[in-house]
Amino acid sequence: MTASTDFAGQVVPDSAAISRRFRRQDRLFFLLTLGSATLVVALLLAILVVLAIEAWPTFSTFGLSFLWGTTWSAPRDIYGALPAVLGTLISSFIAMLIAVPLSVGIAVFLTELCPARLRRPLGTAIELLAGVPSIIYGIVGLFVLVPLMQSTILPVLMATVGQLPLIGRLFQAPAPGIGLLTASFVLSVMILPFITAITRDVFNTVPVMLRESAYGMGMTTWEVVRHIIIPYTRLGMVGGIMLGLGRALGETMAVTFVVGSVTRLQTSIISPSTTISAQIANSFGDADGLQLSSLIALGLILFVLSFCVLALAKWLIGRTDSF
């Protein structure tokens, strides 16, 4: 029996039937959500497996020496990943050196110093930068930043920093305007809104009472930021920085426009060079055989690097609420 009749003669649904129907709906909902989560994990594993299979001819031919090989020559069918890997790491590192202080400063201004009527417009403007297509950054970098680097910035760097011992070697080379340093400037602008937005949100997690107590004790804004906000949010800040690093590691189009795509080791950061993503973008269309496998092996290296960086960032951001 699925229904009963009350004293007024109205049909009342059986509670057991309703309970069974709800359980079936919950079960279906659980299976759908489980399937969605499983699909995401399966796609991630599938990408990793496909990259590993396609990259296997490269590692079976060159072994692990592919990772530190310095020659990339399609005519000789010899390939090494080190120039592209170093170019990726160096350009990302320089971009972080530029973007992180600016991002933290902007986040401090938005959360501590900015007038209330300007806070939302400025925050929105910064977030809109994240929506600009990367190819636009590349075009602006090529037609605006490269001539500026060639005519003004690089000559000044070569005449000043280039004369210093040790570090000066990084700025001693012909300066066509394209190179790792130019790519780093473009990357720093691209990752700036990401780090700023995350840092601002992390700063907003500091309890208002903690802020007000610090100001009530006579602390200046600088002292509050240094002794209260940054220590309280340090893990979240690092997580946001790591997310920005993950974006910088995988950027393709903007870097391809301005890095120069020279597939050999360089001793100067102002010389044309290459990155993993730029190398793949420039060569993938015409590649076949071992060259194609080597490009996919570069993609596998980039996948592992990006996955590790983003996983660490998520872990650090997730721990923010515990401190």
Describe each region flagged by the PLM.
Residues 200-204, 208, 282-323:
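C-terminal transmembrane helix and the adjacent membrane-cytosol boundary/short C-terminal tail
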Residues 255-303:
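Interhelical loop and adjacent transmembrane-helix boundary motif
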Residues 95-126, 147, 313-319:
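Transmembrane-helix boundary motif in ABC transporter permease subunits
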Residues 12-32, 51-95, 115-116, 173, ...:
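Periplasmic/extracellular loop-to-transmembrane helix junction in inner-membrane transport proteins
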Residues 1-37, 313-323:
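Transmembrane alpha-helical segments of polytopic membrane transport and secretion proteins
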Residues 124, 128, 132, 136, ...:
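Transmembrane alpha-helices
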Residues 104-109, 119, 123, 169-216, ...:
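Membrane-cytosol interface at the C-terminal ends of specific transmembrane alpha-helices
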Residues 61-79, 139-189:
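Membrane-interfacial helix termini and adjacent extracytoplasmic/periplasmic loops
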